[in-house]
C-alpha cells in the first residue's frame, strides 16, 4: 500500500514536471514571436535593377509602409503587387533580413514589340507579356508583329491570340525567346504572321528571313548568323530557312 502511494506521488511529480517544461517552451516561443513582431520593422527599402521606373515608383508599388513588420511581411504578395503595377518588370527578388534594409532586386524585360490593333499599339515583351498600351501612331521604333489578332488585350496579361492563330502564337513566343537568348532581338525590325505556311522576319535592315512554324528556332538562328557572317556587309536579300534537311538558301536582291 505504502509502495503504491509512493509510486502515485512520483507519477504526479513527473506529470507536473512535463507540464512545466511545455509551458516554459510556450512562454519562450511567445516571447520570441512578440519580440519579432514588435521590434523588427521596415526602415529603409532599397531597390536595384530598375531602368524604366524610379526607385520611388517601385517602392510605392510594393504596398509596404515604413514601420511595417518585417517578420509578417509576405514576399509573394509584395512581388505580385509590383508585377501588377509595373508591367515592364518580369523578375523580382526580395531579400528580407531582420535589422537590415529591405532589399528588392528587379529585372525589367527587354525592348518590346508592337501589335497594332483597333487604333492602339499593344507593346509585347520578349517574354510574351503585354506591357503597355499606346496610340497606334505612338509605337515609335518598336518592331511590329503583323498578321495576328490579339484576344482581349490587357496590360499586364500574357499575349493571347485568337483561337485560329494558335500555331502562330506558340511559334511567335518560341521565336522571341530564342532571339532574346541569342542576343539577336535588337536586330529584329518586324515579324509577319500573315502567311500560314511560313513566318517572315525583317532582320538587320538587310534581310527578310523565312522560317517554318514550329521550328527549332535556336538552331535556325544559328544558321541565320552563319549565313550573315559569310556575306558582304552591303549584301541584302531573303534568307530561306524553310528546308527540312537543314539547307539554307540566300536569294540576293
State where each predicted segment sits.
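Short extracytoplasmic
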Residues: 53-84
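Extended, alpha-helix-rich binding/interface surfaces that flank or overlap catalytic cores
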Residues: 47
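Charged, solvent-exposed interaction patches on well-folded alpha/beta domains
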Residues: 2-34, 40, 57, 61, ...
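N-terminal functional module detector in eukaryotic proteins
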Residues: 42-44
Amino acid at each position: 500500500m505504502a509502495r503504491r502511494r509512493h509510486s502515485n506521488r512520483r507519477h504526479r511529480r513527473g506529470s507536473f514536471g512535463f507540464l512545466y517544461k511545455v509551458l516554459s517552451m510556450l512562454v519562450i516561443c511567445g516571447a520570441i514571436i512578440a519580440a519579432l513582431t514588435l521590434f523588427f520593422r521596415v526602415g529603409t527599402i532599397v531597390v536595384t535593377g530598375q531602368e524604366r521606373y524610379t526607385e520611388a515608383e517601385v517602392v510605392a508599388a510594393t504596398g509596404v509602409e515604413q514601420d511595417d513588420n518585417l517578420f509578417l511581411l509576405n514576399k509573394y504578395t509584395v512581388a505580385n503587387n509590383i508585377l501588377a503595377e509595373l508591367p515592364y518588370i518580369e523578375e523580382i527578388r526580395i531579400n528580407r533580413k531582420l535589422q537590415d534594409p529591405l532589399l528588392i532586386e528587379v529585372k525589367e524585360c527587354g525592348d518590346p514589340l508592337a501589335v497594332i490593333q483597333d487604333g492602339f499599339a499593344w507593346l509585347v515583351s520578349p517574354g510574351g507579356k503585354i506591357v503597355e498600351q499606346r496610340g497606334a501612331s505612338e509605337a515609335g521604333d518598336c518592331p511590329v508583329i503583323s498578321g495576328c489578332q490579339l484576344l482581349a488585350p490587357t496590360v499586364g496579361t500574357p499575349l493571347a491570340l485568337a483561337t485560329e492563330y494558335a500555331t502562330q502564337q506558340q511559334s511567335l513566343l518560341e521565336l522571341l525567346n530564342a532571339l532574346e537568348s541569342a542576343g539577336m532581338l535588337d536586330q529584329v525590325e518586324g515579324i509577319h504572321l500573315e502567311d500560314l505556311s511560313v513566318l517572315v522576319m525583317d532582320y538587320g535592315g538587310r534581310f527578310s528571313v523565312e522560317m517554318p512554324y514550329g521550328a527549332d528556332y535556336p538552331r535556325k538562328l544559328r544558321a541565320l548568323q552563319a549565313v550573315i557572317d559569310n556575306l558582304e556587309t552591303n549584301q541584302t536579300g531573303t534568307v530561306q530557312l524553310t528546308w527540312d534537311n537543314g539547307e539554307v538558301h540566300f536569294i540576293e536582291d
